[in-house]
Amino acid sequence: MTLLALGINHKTAPVSLRERVTFSPESIDQALASLLQQPLVQGGVVLSTCNRTELYLSVEQQENLHEQLIAWLCNYHKLSPDEVKKSLYWHHGNDAVSHLMRVASGLDSLVLGEPQILGQVKKAFAESQREQSLSGELERLFQKTFSVAKRVRTETEIGASAVSVAFAACTLARQIFESLSELNVLLVGAGETIELVARHLREHQVKHMIIANRTRERAQALATEVGAEVITLPEIDARLADADIIISSTASPLPIIGKGMVERALKSRRNQPMLFVDIAVPRDIEPEVGKLSNAYLYSVDDLQAIIQHNMAQRQAAAVQAESIVQQESMNFMTWLRAQGAVETIRDYRSQAEQVRSEMTAKALAAIEQGANVEQVVNELAHKLTNRLIHAPTKSLQQAASDGDMERLQLLRDSLGLDQH
């Protein structure tokens, strides 16, 4: 048995191929059942996200193993092997162990250190548990991986700094204002970036959130989720003075918030400061706003500088995280090799016990039939000795015949012949 990881990800395949190899949540149970029907597969976990599709398997190692698994993957997704082969990567044994630990810790992610992948790995593991498709080795590996990912999070700073535009915008707001709990926030737009910003702000318990969008319908679902008020874009002028922080990200070709609008808001607020974060391209807020007193305007380029600085910090933390993964993967492989020894010892003891049981039964039967007890005992001892030393004797003879002195010495050591 060996552990194997294979897959494709954002580094090896374009989205046009990744989307054809993905497993939908509804199909995971069928995929696992089909996978475990393959003769060489003893257990499996299927991890499928927008950036990667990976199989983690415990398998019987054979020469045509890769070909069999490629054939299964291609048949399942109705692809030709030529479409997939060049994008597939393979990791065996310790490499498979360290790869999974790196993935779960965010070290192999498109955004270094992102935390979402750990939840996705846990979900994939839970699916395999539910479908009873885990081998003992895989179950132990994933449990170990979760503890390693937690250790990486707690012992390094890999997740401490913002490396997404949405997170950076919220980080900037928290740097300028000590607490967000007494502040009102206006979000302009209702796209993916604003969704992420809104969720971050909800976690920091802002006083009140307003979402302004071209249509109310698009913004209403997000507003319901985060407890926000919804207004339309034309209403911004009347409500701008209510906001301490304005974060904007729309696809508008022209600015939505102009200098005059901000001047009126500042006058209404009696010049209480306002933070503007414009993460739209083209810009949603006129650059001249940044020249007004008590109006602090940051563009997407300003956020990129924050992100680049934070990414450098994450890169430094990643070095420490890689060291943790290397250490823990070696620890796991030590345990795995020990399990192989346990199984061998169990088989050896079972074989010896079977010989003892068979020969004892014959000896007792002979005594019951009136045979001389001393003779039966001597014969039992003689036959038992011959049976137990037969296989080791053949191995010793073969090693000597082959001139394999290293193996011969190994056999002597295992039989305790050089012990005093």
Curated annotation (Swiss-Prot):
Substrate binds at residues 49-52, 109, 114-116, 120. The keyword Translocase does not apply. Its EC number is 1.2.1.70. GO terms for biological process: protoporphyrinogen IX biosynthetic process from glutamate. Keywords: NADP, Oxidoreductase, Porphyrin biosynthesis. PROSITE patterns: GLUTR. It catalyses: (S)-4-amino-5-oxopentanoate + tRNA(Glu) + NADP(+) = L-glutamyl-tRNA(Glu) + NADPH + H(+). The keyword Chloroplast does not apply. InterPro entries: 4pyrrol_synth_GluRdtase, 4pyrrol_synth_GluRdtase_dimer, 4pyrrol_synth_GluRdtase_N, GluRdtase_CS, GluRdtase_dimer_dom_sf, GluRdtase_N_sf, NAD(P)-bd_dom_sf, Shikm_DH/Glu-tRNA_Rdtase. The active site is at 50 (nucleophile). Belongs to the glutamyl-tRNA reductase family. Homodimer. PANTHER family: GLUTAMYL-TRNA REDUCTASE. Catalyzes the NADPH-dependent reduction of glutamyl-tRNA(Glu) to glutamate 1-semialdehyde (GSA). Possesses an unusual extended V-shaped dimeric structure with each monomer consisting of three distinct domains arranged along a curved 'spinal' alpha-helix. The N-terminal catalytic domain specifically recognizes the glutamate moiety of the substrate. The second domain is the NADPH-binding domain, and the third C-terminal domain is responsible for dimerization. NCBIfam families: hemA. During catalysis, the active site Cys acts as a nucleophile attacking the alpha-carbonyl group of tRNA-bound glutamate with the formation of a thioester intermediate between enzyme and glutamate, and the concomitant release of tRNA(Glu). The thioester intermediate is finally reduced by direct hydride transfer from NADPH, to form the product GSA. This is Glutamyl-tRNA reductase.
